[in-house]
Regions:
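Short internal beta-strands
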Residues: 13-17, 94-95, 269, 287
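Hydrophobic packing residues within well-ordered alpha-helices of enzyme cores
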Residues: 23-27, 144, 192
Length: 317
C-alpha cells in the first residue's frame, strides 16, 4: 500500500478471499494512509486474471496497477506509473534480471517491446523475470474474456498479457532498478527485512537505561523500554516494546508491544504483542506472528528457528 500511495494512487481495491478478516483488520478503510480502500471479494482462487475481471466495475475505465502483495521493491513504482501514463500502451509489466530465470515467468523482448511470456522455461531465452506488478489500460478486459483456464483451473494474467501481444497491441517492459524481493518464503522475508533495516537512520525515542548497550544503527520508537540489554543494529524496536535482560540483533525487527525477556534473538522478525521469555538458547532466522508466546523449559540444541502464525503458543521442553 505504501508503494502505491508513494506513486500517487489514492483509490485502491483489495481483492480478498478466505483470509479477508485479517486483511480488513490490517488495512481498514485506508484512512491510515489518507486513501480510499474498496474490498473486492473473490469467492475462491481463480487466478490473477479472474481477480482483474471482477474488479472491472471498481476500475471504471481508468488505467490501473495490479500489485501482488508479496512483492517488495527498493525504489517503489513511481517511475513505473509515470512511464505508463506519459504514453500509455495496452500493458506495461515490471521485470527484473535474475540468476535463475527457470524458476520464474520470463519475458522475451524485441525492439523495446514484450513479444512472449514463458512460465518457468526449461531453456530460458531471457533472464527477465516477471516481478508481479503490472499496469493496464481497458484492453486487458477483452483479453481476460478470451482466455481459458490453465491446467490448474485458473485464469492466468500471463495468458491475458500474451493475448494482448497476439492481438498486435503494445506490451511494454519496465526493468526494476534496485533490489526486488518476492517475500513468499521465510528466507526471502528475512532478506527483505535485512535490506530495509539497512536503509533506516538512527533514531532513539524510547527509554534506554544506563545498564544497556546500543551498537550500530538502531531505531527505538516512542515508549519502548530497553533495560539491562544489548541491542545491535541494524535493528528496530517498536513502540511500547520491552527488551529486558536480553540480546537483540543484528538484523532484527521487534514490532509494537512485544516483550523480549531474558532471551537472545537475531536475524528475525517478531510481530505485535508477542512474548519471548527465558530462552536459554538463541532464536535466529525466525518469523514470529502476532500475539505469540514462547516460553523456555529445557533444550539441548544450540539454536531455535521458528515460523509461527498469529496467536501461536510454543512451550519448549
Amino acid at each position: 500500500i505504501e508503494a502505491l500511495v508513494s506513486a500517487g494512487i489514492r483509490d485502491i481495491g483489495v481483492v480478498v478471499g478466505d483470509t479477508q478478516a485479517e486483511i480488513r483488520s490490517a488495512v481498514g478503510d485506508g484512512s491510515a494512509w489518507n486513501i480510499k480502500v474498496t474490498y473486492i471479494e473473490q469467492d475462491e482462487p481463480r487466478g490473477l486474471a479472474h481477480a482483474v475481471s471482477i474488479s472491472q466495475d471498481f476500475i471504471n475505465g481508468s488505467p490501473f496497477v495490479v500489485y501482488l502483495g508479496d512483492n517488495l521493491l527498493n525504489h517503489g513504482i513511481g517511475t513505473f506509473v509515470e512511464e505508463f501514463l506519459q504514453n500509455p500502451p495496452a500493458a506495461q509489466i515490471l521485470l527484473s534480471h535474475v540468476t535463475n530465470p527457470e524458476m520464474f515467468g520470463v519475458a522475451e523482448l524485441s525492439d523495446g517491446k514484450v513479444t512472449r511470456l514463458v512460465e518457468k522455461p526449461k531453456t530460458p531465452m531471457s533472464d527477465l523475470a516477471l516481478v508481479g506488478v503490472y499496469m493496464f489500460g481497458p484492453e486487458v478486459f477483452t483479453s481476460v474474456k478470451r482466455i481459458s483456464p490453465s491446467s490448474r483451473n485458473e485464469l492466468e494474467i500471463t495468458d491475458a498479457i500474451q493475448d494482448l501481444i497476439d492481438r498486435g497491441l503494445i506490451v511494454r517492459p519496465h526493468i526494476v532498478k534496485g533490489w526486488w524481493k518476492d517475500t513468499g518464503k521465510l528466507e526471502d522475508i528475512l532478506e527483505a527485512n535485512r535490506l530495509i533495516l539497512k536503509t533506516f537512520e538512527q533514531r532513539i525515542d524510547g527509554h534506554v537505561d544506563a545498564n544497556s548497550l546500543i551498537e550500530g544503527k538502531i531505531v527505538i520508537d516512542a515508549d519502548a523500554i530497553i533495560e539491562r540489554s544489548v541491542v545491535r543494529g541494524p535493528a528496530i524496536i517498536g513502540a511500547r516494546a520491552k527488551i529486558i535482560d536480553s540480546h537483540v540483533g543484528p538484523y532484527t525487527s521487534i514490532m509494537n508491544d512485544v516483550v523480549i525477556k531474558n532471551s537472545e534473538i537475531e536475524n528475525s522478525i517478531v510481530l505485535e504483542q508477542s512474548l519471548i521469555s527465558d530462552l536459554a538458547t538463541r532464536v535466529t532466522d525466525s518469523l514470529i506472528g502476532k500475539n505469540v508466546r514462547i516460553h523456555y523449559r529445557k533444550s539441548t540444541s544450540q539454536a531455535y528457528s521458528f515460523m509461527l502464525g498469529d496467536n501461536s503458543e510454543v512451550n519448549i521442553s
